[in-house]
């Protein structure tokens, strides 16, 4: 939840979810 993954999730889900990132406030974050 605190580390930006450098990916947005406005239109599509987080591709970085495979490395533990999740969508919060239209941006993908890890932890």
Swiss-Prot record:
Output the PTM entry: This is a cyclic peptide. Contains 3 disulfide bonds.
Span of the secretion signal?
none
GO BP term, example: defense response
Q: Which domain of life is it from?
A: Eukaryota
Q: Which SUPFAM superfamilies match?
A: Cyclotides
Q: Of which family is this protein a member?
A: Belongs to the cyclotide family. Bracelet subfamily.
The job of this chain, per UniProt, is described as: Probably participates in a plant defense mechanism.
Protein name per its UniProtKB record: Cyclotide mra3
**Taxonomic source organism:** Melicytus ramiflorus
């Amino acid at each position: 939840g605190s580390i930006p993954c450098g990916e947005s999730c406005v239109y599509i889900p987080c591709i970085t979810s495979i490395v533990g990132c999740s969508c919060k406030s239209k941006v993908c974050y890890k932890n």
